[in-house]
Amino acid sequence: MIDKKNITIGIVAGEVSGDILGAGLIRALKIQYPQARFIGIAGKNMLAEGCKTLVDMEDIAVMGLVEVIKYLPRLLKIRRLVIDTMLAEKPDIFIGIDAPDFNLDIELKLKKQGIKTLHYVSPSVWAWRQKRIFKIAQATNLVLAFLPFEKAFYDRFNVPCRFVGHTMADIIDLQPDRQDACFQLNLEPKHRYVAILVGSREAEVQFLTPPFLQTAQLIKQRFPDVQFLVPLVNEKRRKQFEQIKAQIAPHLEVIFLDGQARQAMIVAEASLLASGTASLECMLCKSPMVVGYKMKPFTYFLAKRLVKTKYISLPNLLADDMLVPEMIQEDCTAEKLAEKLSVYLEQTESGIKNRQHLIQQFTQLHQLIRCDADKQAAQAVIDLLNDEV
C-alpha cells in the first residue's frame, strides 16, 4: 500500500481541455491523498488545484503540422526537461493527459525506468493509425477511455484499459433546461430555432459555411418561422463566416452567439453541425442533428483510406448504428442537408414521434457514459498505485 503522506504524482496536460480534466482528477485524488504532491505541466485550472508546473502549458499547446515543425526544437527541449525532472523526482505514478504525440514518448521512457504510467484520454487509434496501439501498450500501464467502444478496441489487443465515462456527460443534465438556456441567450422560448455550427477550425468554416448557409435558406423557405443561431468560437471565425455569408446569403437573418454552443444546442429544435466532439455535445443536449463534413478533395482521398470506422459522428459510433444522418463530401449539399433537417422540423404526428424516439435514444447513450468520470479516473490511478490493475 502506498504511503499517503509522501506520494508524488507526475502529470502533464497539453491543452485547455486536458487542463480541465487534470484539475478534476487532482480534486478527486486529493480526497484520498490530501498530502499528495503534483508536478508536471499545468494550465490555470490545475495550478489552482496546487499542481506545480515546469513550463507554461501554452508552450506545448501547438496544433497543425506546420506549427509543430516550427516549434519542434522547443517541444523537444520541454519534453527532455519533463523526462529529466521525473527521473530525478521519481514520482509514484506519471499521468499523461491526452496530447499523445507529446506524452507517449515521456511515458515510454519513464516506464522503462520503472515508473508507473497512465494515459488519460485514448488517442483515436480505433479510427485511424491503429498500429499506434503497440506503442501505447509499451508506454503505459493503463489507458483511461471516455467511451465504451474505445475500451472494446483495447481489449482486442489485450492492452489494459478502463472505461471511466465522459466528463461532459457528467456536466450536462440528462434533461437540459431549455427555458434557462433561452434566458441565458436572451431568446424568446416560444420561437423555433435551428443551430448552425460550422466548427472551430479555419478549414471547417471555409468548407462548411457555404452549404450550411444554403441549407438555412432552403429551411427558411419551407419553415418561415424558424430562426437560426450561429455560435462562433472567436472574432476571427466570426469575421470569416460573415465574409462568406455576404457572398452566399446576404439577406438571411441569423443570430450570432459568442461561443455558447451548448446553450444553442439546448434551445434548438434541430442542429446542423460539423463532426467531432460537437456531435457528442449535441447528443447530450438532446438536440436532433444532421452532421455535415467537407474537406479538400485530396485530404478526403487520404482520410477515406486511413479511417477504419463505419461512422464519423460520436452518437453513431456509440450506438453502432446510423442514429443521425452523416452527409460527407459530395453528399454535403444544401438540398440533401435540408431534406434530412426538415424531418426534425415537421410538426406532424410522425415528425414529433421521430424526434421523441431519437431524444430517448440520446438519453440512453447519455446514461451509458455518465459515470462520474473524475471519481472513476481517480480510482483507476489509486488502483494502479496499489498494484490492483
UniProtKB/Swiss-Prot annotation:
The keyword Transferase is assigned to this record: yes
GO MF terms, alphabetically ordered: lipid-A-disaccharide synthase activity; phospholipid binding
EC number: 2.4.1.182
Pathway where it operates: Bacterial outer membrane biogenesis; LPS lipid A biosynthesis
CDD domains to which the protein is assigned, alphabetical: Glycosyltransferase_GTB-type (cd01635)
Coiled coil segments of this chain: none
InterPro entries the UniProt entry points to: Glyco_trans_19
GO BP field: lipid A biosynthetic process
The entry's keywords: Glycosyltransferase, Lipid A biosynthesis, Lipid biosynthesis, Lipid metabolism, Transferase
GO CC aspect terms: membrane
UniProt enzyme class: transferase
UniProt cross-references to Pfam families, sorted A to Z: LpxB
Record's catalysed reaction(s): a lipid X + a UDP-2-N,3-O-bis[(3R)-3-hydroxyacyl]-alpha-D-glucosamine = a lipid A disaccharide + UDP + H(+)
Source taxon at top rank: Bacteria
Family designation: Belongs to the LpxB family.
HAMAP family documented for this protein: LpxB
Function: Condensation of UDP-2,3-diacylglucosamine and 2,3-diacylglucosamine-1-phosphate to form lipid A disaccharide, a precursor of lipid A, a phosphorylated glycolipid that anchors the lipopolysaccharide to the outer membrane of the cell.
Protein name, UniProt field: Lipid-A-disaccharide synthase
